[in-house]
């Protein structure tokens, strides 16, 4: 009887502790999302229900180009970031060289540099009158590199470079943690029975780390599909990233269209999260059956 009473008090305390953050979530996250979805289906003049905002986004040239350009950049960033990060993580995990230790101590450094500072620093280096161009002027005029201009501003190349700068350390951190959890005895046992490096990787390392790779993919995609600072400063005027296009709509007080763009960004992010959650749920179901 006394134990039941204590359990009731404990459960009541837990519920009471959860109510404040739940109310904050409802007020600052759930409610704005619902309001945004409702507003995206409203006519700007009459406030009547309509699909015109979404029809405009997926049929007109400017918003359609923004959606495709953003998605293309996000997918390319995910592929390059995760691929490079996985190779870096493998090198740091399975190499005892001084270089791997140096990389292990330094690879998180870009995470401590504010994004705005990093983007402007990059501009001063690669712009047409930047550091690289000025250094190239020191070369003989007969050199092919004399007066070299990287041409990395206001196009996809510059955005991709900065995306890799921001995302490789983050993805590497996640994957390194996953690889560190793989027991050395598993690798040694596989090698003892004659398994080569490729077989060890595909049959042991990759299956034991792919869940964390999916986590990296999910977060890198979500952060880039809604990015604003980098494309706003060094991106082209057309096509624009969805974040930059969203800011333009707000400035023009086209709030219903802006709400529709916000919903599209949210759906892109939700899709990547769903893939990760579905994979984990499927694996959990498989393990429970086993």
Locations of regions flagged by a protein language model:
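Amphipathic cytosolic juxtamembrane alpha-helices at the membrane-cytosol interface
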Residues: 7-12, 68, 156-158, 182-215
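Non-cytoplasmic
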Residues: 32-36, 171-174, 212-244
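C-terminal transmembrane helix and the adjacent membrane-cytosol boundary/short C-terminal tail
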Residues: 33, 176-187, 259-290
């Amino acid at each position: 009887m006394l134990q039941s009473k204590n359990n009731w008090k404990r459960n009541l305390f837990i519920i009471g502790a959860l109510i404040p953050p739940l109310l904050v979530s409802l007020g600052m996250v759930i409610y704005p999302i619902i309001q945004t979805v409702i507003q995206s289906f409203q006519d700007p003049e009459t406030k009547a229900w309509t699909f015109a905002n979404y029809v405009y986004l997926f049929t007109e040239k400017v918003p359609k180009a923004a959606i495709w350009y953003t998605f293309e950049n996000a997918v390319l960033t995910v592929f390059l970031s995760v691929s490079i990060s996985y190779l870096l993580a493998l090198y740091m995990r399975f190499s005892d060289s001084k270089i791997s230790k140096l990389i292990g101590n330094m690879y998180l450094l870009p995470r401590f540099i504010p994004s705005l500072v990093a983007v402007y620093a990059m501009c001063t280096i690669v712009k047409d009158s930047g550091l690289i161009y000025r250094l190239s002027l020191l070369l003989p005029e007969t050199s092919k590199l004399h007066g070299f201009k990287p041409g990395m501003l206001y196009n996809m190349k510059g955005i991709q470079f900065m995306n890799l700068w921001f995302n490789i350390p983050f993805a590497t951190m996640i994957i390194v943690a996953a690889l560190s959890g793989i027991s050395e005895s598993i690798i040694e046992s596989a090698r003892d029975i004659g398994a080569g490096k490729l077989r060890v990787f595909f049959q042991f390392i990759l299956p034991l780390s792919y869940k964390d790779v999916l986590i990296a993919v999910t977060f890198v995609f979500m952060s880039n599909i809604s990015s604003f600072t980098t494309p706003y400063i060094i991106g082209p005027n057309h096509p624009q990233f969805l974040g930059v296009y969203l800011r333009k709509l707000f400035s023009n007080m086209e709030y219903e269209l802006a709400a529709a763009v916000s919903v599209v960004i949210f759906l892109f992010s939700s899709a990547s999260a769903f893939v990760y959650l579905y994979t984990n749920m499927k694996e959990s179901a498989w393990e429970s059956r086993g």
